[in-house]
Amino acid sequence: VNHSLKPAHLDQTDLRVALGGPDCKQPYSASLLNISAMSYGSLSANAVLALNSGAKMGNFAHNTGEGGISKFHHQGGGDLIWQIGTGYFACRNNNGSFSAEKFAEKASQDQVKMIEIKLSQGAKPGHGGILPAAKLTKEIAEIRGVPMGQDVNSPPGHSAFSTPLELMEFVQLLREKSGGKPIGFKLCVGKRREFLAICKAMHETGIKPDFITVDGGEGGTGAAPLEFTNNIGSPLSEGLIFVNNALTGFDLRKDIRIISSGKVMSGFGIVKRLALGADLCNSARAMMMALGCIQALKCNTNRCPVGVATTDRTLMYGLDPSDKKVRVYNLHKNLEKSVCEIIGAMGLKDTDDLRPWHLMRRISATEIKHYGEIYEYLEPGSLLQSDIPKSYARAVASAQSSSFDSVRH
């Protein structure tokens, strides 16, 4: 980014973002940076407690991951974003299907501020997930509503809906059963027409999520095939720009917040995502580092040597929540401070002032362009007109609200 000869001052306490569209009855004021989805079971009890306690100290939110809400989330007392994945853990029937009654019971908790439907994640889009039986304790099994002694699988896709229109109906169902709390979904961008089909469903039904979390292919996990981690899913910048364009093109952007996640590790990383179209960011990797993660690559073995990604009590005791919660709090505070200083140095007075042209990229040894020149940015409603931009025309024509399949088979 380029600095200004007339720098501005930003107050760190002003870095809040309101989430909740026209149909939301309980809007939430979120921090600019929050903890991205990581499940209890994948993470240790002490890790979850430290993360949530740090979130409480710093007044930011903690995404539960798809593993459900544990007593360690409650002990921390921090705001929760309850993530619901394809396994419907903590809100499932015995056959693994979604239970609206169990969902309503959990969603009514005051600590739950928002609900996020997980469609896919950047580390392994289209693959599903697994909690090895070695990491499954009786407590985790009770929280998730699964039997002991076997791997816990999250299917690649959802059973509660199978089309874009049904996804919107599911969003509406969760909104009603939660008492009007913000409802959104998370995805890593894959086939463009599929997200455009969701946009068509929003436009046709008038049902819109309150937020969409865009995860980049850079996102990580300790339990994903390397081929998926390295090769599948749109990178965050391209995915973020596309989602912003699609929502803008269908004139939906004004009612929907975009959350960016995927290797957000620095103040500049946050500024970059905001300039490209995000309203706020989530981070998992940086938060794990604050907990003491040394990237030992043992996440899926239950032998994490620093007690972050294990249910082994002997190893878990090496992580002291009373110490690590302060580190989580300090990380968040210092990253937001860095954001304020960078934006102030640019001469801007608010994060909302960031635009793609503020972000510069070297193209060659002799050429620099800003992101407004490198990428196309659509005008509001441009995908609803007869003269659809050429770069989007084929994908829009192939998208249908009644199916994720292409119109052109």
Predicted features by range, described:
Residues 72, 229, 260, 290, ...:
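Flexible domain-boundary/linker segments
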Residues 125-149, 183, 242-252, 275-281, ...:
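Short flexible/disordered coil segments
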Residues 15, 22, 31, 35, ...:
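General secondary-structure edge motif
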Residues 292-356:
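Active-site or pore-adjacent capping/gating segments
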Residues 1-153, 166, 326, 330, ...:
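N-terminal capping/small domains of soluble enzymes
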Residues 153-316:
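Glycine-rich phosphate/ribose-binding loops and adjacent secondary-structure elements
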Residues 76, 102, 135-137, 205, ...:
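Alpha-helix boundary/interfacial micro-motifs
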